[in-house]
Amino acid sequence: MKCFYSFLFLLGSLLASGQTTDVKYLSGQGSDDAVEWDFFCTGGRKSGEWNKIKVPSCWEMEGYGTFNYGHDKPKADESGLYKTTFEVPATWKGKRIFIVFEGSMTDTEIKVNGKQAGTPHQGAFYRFKREITKLVHMNKENLLEVKVNKMSSNTSINEAERQCDFWVFGGIFRPVYLEAVPNNFIEYTAIDARQHGELNADIFIDKKLSDIKAEIEIKDVQNQTIGKITSAPINEKTGKISLSGKIDNIKPWSAEDPQLYTAIITLRQKDKVLHTVTDRIGFRTVEVKPKDGVYINGVKMRFKGVNRHSHWPTTGRTTNKQLSINDVKLMKEMNMNAVRMSHYPPDKHFLEVCDSLGMYVIDELCAWQYPPYDTKVGTILVGEMLKRDLNRPSIIFWANGNEGGFNFDLDPLFPQYDPQKRAVLHPWALSGNINTVHYIKYNSGIGNMFHGRDIFMPTEILHGLYDGGHGAGLDDYWDLMLSNPLSAGMLLWDFTDQAVVREDKNGFYDTDKDHGADGIVGPYREKEGSFFTIKEIWSPIHLPEHYLTPGWDGRFEIENRYAFTNANACNYTYRLAKINSLAQKTIQSVSGKIASPDIRPGERGYLQLELPSGWQEYDFLYVTVKDRYNQELFTWSYEIGTPDRLANRLLPQEGSTPAVKESIDNWYFSAAGTEVTFDKQNGLLRSVTSGGKAIPLNNGPVLISNQDIICKSVEYKQVEGNPQLIATYTSRNGKNTVYTFTWTMLPSGIVELDYNYRPQDMVKMAGITFDFPEKEIAGATLLANGPYRVYNNRMKGGSLNIWEKKYNNTITGESWDYPEFKGYYSLFYGMKLDCPTPFEVYSGKEDVTLHLFTPAVQEQYDPKRNHTIVDYPKGNLSFMNAIPAVGTKFGKAEDFGPQSQPHRARGNGPENNVSGKLYFRF
């Protein structure tokens, strides 16, 4: 950000010189400072009369017109009439004046003082300008009138921009301003700045002049001049001025180290300065080497990215610079390095933030699917997009449409404008020597994709929907891509849930059912569980899974997955934690620094921890890595002890001799104020009381199984003075023992449950389950991997810790109270359930997953075709050894890799059985 503020200071200094471009905003610069204009809507809500509206804005979000999602048919076709007044600064006398629109949906007709300013513009997402020099009054108020037709008179624009899978709006949704330039001015510049300082630039001026030259001066972030290049005379045939030279001692731009410079371009006629413009540039080289890879500054890349719409729930497509900063920071927090502009060029400030904070960008010409823009209007829009965005170092690819919305006649225009000759992609197709195929299944391809000879980089993959996709399956996909030399990475679909606040529906958050609920974050950027899964998997410093033993020497093998950064640029710390109760404030910790290892990009090495003596007595180890900017890459957590060790330390051991009673139907065990009732016929828990108060835990442990089993016997006995009840279940024919469990009442009142079962082969779930009424629950304190729930193909991203969770009935993507309460929690150690009579339960075995109630099913989507609804046990509290994976919007879970498959459990001996132990403290 230091680069950005230095640029603003420099720009302000130049504007004072008098030969620059002066700017006066007629609107706000974004949704956070919008200005009111007069407005008349021709149809829908609040139509038929003049009112006020904020500019910029989408008029539907301001209470006017009719909402439409892109799939709606037919669509509303109202128009908006705008009026405002403005004055022209006296200092602009003698200059040429233009009115500039950064974006207007869709056909836009401009009048100044009753006279039309040029031809109407068609196309929503593109900056356009019209000269109004002869239409304005210099010494009195001017009237601006704008008519915006939501539906274009050009059918191809409606097909490309409005028959689509996103919200479609109407209105002047980006800023409007006046520009004043000298009579002879620089129209735009096209700069190619390479990694070693080579610089080539084309300067385009508004009209041919004689004796014209240009100069580029390069200044660093300290505003020090580091080099200048002077042009040859203007090329009379092309009307452009070309410069070529080399700037020494530059630092190349990359997403890891986004070094920016200020380019000051001055147009001269002999010794007279005609016009000066500035731009921020970065020196970097992008190469696509066919059948090899994509290289940035000579280094082969794998892009870790996401698709992003320009969207905010209360303002639609109208955003602001702070929102762009926040979004890029969120992407970088997930350790992403790339973003695709789906499916249109974004706000200018978003690209500027990508330049400043460091993101690789695919900038896209709109066309959601077939048909695309026609060639006539498409030619205009390509020019408008590239003239605005050419010099952004963050942009490494152009995209001509999406998923079949390709007008191939427009492809040659991109290199005509772009001296960098960046590849032009056709997202979902093979183009620019890159296969951008969408939504590929794991390890798929015959002669292509994972099994081809072309570079492949899916520009959409692992389609999110509700709580599915994104991080689910990513671990397997990413490992496979890392092993494939032709993989250039991937871009997830998509960044944020596209919900709009419908004031016409009492503030309902509308995602158009399942169409817009695709995000890694919610409409207000609420983080879903996949956010942290992605963060761990895409961390550029990678720590593998590791099981700590008492004799461990404190050394981790780690991998540096940065492209340019040595591992010693990062900071490393550890923390040891000892759990003394299920309360955060009782955690006992000790922490320390770890020496930063010297590991070059792409190589492996070792991280050596110097742990204090007695570290083995702690329960968990946390290792945190922060980048050179002190931003956390990830914190990994590791088990030191076992759940059984922790449970025995936390639970009371003393008490009174347990009592036993028997009736015709039940056994009753009691000790230390706790009484439990078991069914004589099946051994299942029937009721619990503690201190005379009922705890409605019952009907368990039921084996989670599709097997037809029967209870063969329930046996009572005493072991060391403690009553036990042993239940044995067999297959219906009685030949094979399938399941046994043993209840033991301890003197402390702790009820111990030991169980052993033979799992079936090829199952989604395995474990035991109990009933407990959901209406009793206020929350829970978990000692487990959290705070988000997991699926079998989305285990990463959490942390072993104490998590205090309030009850909610969140439906991911329909309500956004995160983290969700219900679901699966891995590495379960213990839990205190907050209910009228709270109780605790602890695991005595590793690798148990808690099923904490069953999430509600989405209300807005047909469950028969929803691959993001997973299976849960019939009970509400379950202790699992196998849980299901979750799918994506377009695919069932089994399509997405090894972790997404049903669980295999083939084996013949008792060693293949699964055993577990639970301690209940009622």
For each predicted feature, which ranges?
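Substrate-binding/catalytic cleft of secreted carbohydrate-active enzymes
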Residues: V328-M331, A338-G529, T533
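Substrate-binding clefts and catalytic carboxylate motifs of secreted carbohydrate-active enzymes
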Residues: Q29-G48, D77, S104, W167-G171, ...
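Active-site-adjacent substrate/metal-binding segments within catalytic domains
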Residues: M61-V88, W92-V112, G118-H121, E179, ...
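An acidic-aromatic loop/edge-strand motif
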Residues: T21, C58-E62, T66, G70, ...
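Beta-strand/loop-rich accessory regions of lumenal/periplasmic or secreted enzymes
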Residues: G103, K150, S254, G614-Q616, ...
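Beta-strand-rich binding/interaction modules
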Residues: V112, E198-P233, G239-I241, G554-K593, ...
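Accessory carbohydrate-binding/adhesion or oligomerization-edge regions at the termini
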Residues: G18-G70, K147, M151, S156, ...
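Accessory beta-strand-rich segments of carbohydrate-active enzymes
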Residues: T20, S31, F40-G44, D72, ...
